[in-house]
Amino acid sequence: MKAYVFPGQGAQFTGMVKDLYENSKLAKELFEKANEILGFRITDIMFEGTAEELKETKVTQPAVFLHSVILAKTLEDFKPEMVAGHSLGEFSALVANGALSFEDGLKLVSQRALAMQKACEIKPSTMAAVLGLADNIVEEVCASIDGVVVAANYNCPGQLVISGEISAVER
């Protein structure tokens, strides 16, 4: 069985799919369309920006979405039997499956990212992946810390994401 599984936020890195942009007419057209839709040159940040610029939610989410969707569109001969996505990757899966257009998917992801960015500016917070500990241990540690910190995403056994106030998460 062939499948695409698309990642969520956190999979970004500077320079991702730059080679595809430079060598694929379809990829370049889609990236340029994305620059227009977003109202800024996300390609400049994706290909040449700093890790800090790329880490901003309002940039990260559209960048990861574009990486996933454009890669899938350039591999259309692959024809997966199923698609799935983790968190943000669910939007990429919807576009890859034809349930959403590229344009609508990008607009939704951009609005989602802006809303999340705004929420972070109103109430500064953060997330951190905790690897190699049992869920109940992480939950107990979170409960013992002053401030707000909770187990937020149970990714898989041994990988849990915590979120909350910056000072509490950093403890």
Predicted regions and their residues:
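Structural motif
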Residues: 83-86, 152
